[in-house]
Design a protein with these regions (language model features):
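Conserved GTP-binding G-domain of TRAFAC-class P-loop NTPases and closely related GTPase folds
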Residues: 111-189
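Conserved P-loop
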Residues: 1-53, 57-58, 62
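Generic beta-sheet signal
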Residues: 14-16, 105, 141
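Structured loop/turn residues at beta-strand edges in well-structured enzyme cores
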Residues: 46, 98, 133
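A general structural signal for short secondary-structure junctions and capping/turn motifs
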Residues: 2-5, 94-96, 128-132, 142
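Short, well-ordered beta-strand core segments
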Residues: 11, 102, 138-140
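P-loop NTPase motor core
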Residues: 55-130
Length: 189
């Protein structure tokens, strides 16, 4: 739903699970893959300044399911998956121009103590990398009787964070177009 207000030619959508969008719209620039090197090559050639990787968590899951019986050492599988995912984040930061924004959409999970974190696979990403620490902005989607919203900062129980004064409110509409505009205005890009 958060992509709904982008124009058809405003984003490059990387549709990891190759599924239909939850609203009536088709984007002009779509790549259906979960292959990290292919995603990286495509990001270099994309015709827009905004990309969305939805749902990036399935990059991890799909690779694990493909490789789980092929590798004798399960730890090697997790290491390979973790390295691929980490390298995607590093690539985005190092290889793309500063005015290109890549939104990485993922699911979350909540533990027994009500702490919410990104849903990861393997201890490398959960304990060693801290994916949310690799980004400046992490918004969390919540749902209530009024609809879907983004949380812009955390009270310590989840990963929501954004720069000081980027957003006026703690809770904002679940509209990535509005978020994109706010980020570009904040950083002057």
């Amino acid at each position: 739903r958060s992509l709904k207000n982008f124009g058809e030619n405003e984003i490059f959508l990387i549709n990891v699970e190759r599924k239909f969008l939850p609203f009536r719209k088709k984007f002009d620039y779509v790549l259906k893959t979960d292959n990290v090197p292919k995603i990286q090559r495509s990001l270099l050639k994309m015709p827009t300044k905004t990309a969305v990787i939805d749902d990036a968590g399935y990059i991890l899951t799909n690779r694990y399911m493909r490789e789980k019986g092929q590798v004798k050492n399960t730890f090697e599988t997790y290491d390979n998956i973790g390295n691929d995912f980490w390298s995607l984040f590093e690539f985005i930061k190092a290889e793309l121009p500063d005015d290109v924004i890549v939104y990485i959409i993922m699911h979350e999970e909540t533990d027994d103590y009500n702490n919410t974190k990104l849903k990861m696979m393997g201890k490398v990403l959960e304990q060693k990398v801290c994916v949310e620490g690799m980004v400046s902005i992490a918004l969390r989607c919540i749902t209530d009787e009024e609809g879907h919203h983004f949380v812009t900062n955390s009270g310590g129980k989840d990963i929501s964070k954004s720069p000081e004064e980027m957003f006026e409110n703690l809770i904002i509409d679940n509209d990535l177009k509005v978020v994109d505009t706010a980020i570009r205005e904040y950083y002057g890009i």
